Amino acid sequence: CHELVPEGKIGNMLLGGLMYPLSCKPEDVFETLQENRSWQFFGDVQARGAYPGYMQRYFRDNGITLTITDADREALKTTVDFISFSYYMTGCVTAGEALNQQARGNI
């Protein structure tokens, strides 16, 4: 796009679904961090041009192997110019599974 239209802008569209811990318990805070990372990952790759360390660790810990070529790495460096949101909502996360289903919001 930038070669064809130098002033053109390329963006992405994400769901803004930020989660907050239901309590200040460390396990709720950690669970919230994990939950937010699971959806922020897509924007991180598109805006920063590389797979973030936390997802590389997730892939490694879960036996997921990606075949990424040098050409793929180069293509990822072509980042978006802006991020847009199609929908915004918040919810709460807790490490307690039963309560977590009630606290998560409408998705």
Task: Please annotate each region the language model reported.
Residues 1-107:
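Active-site region of glycoside hydrolase catalytic domains
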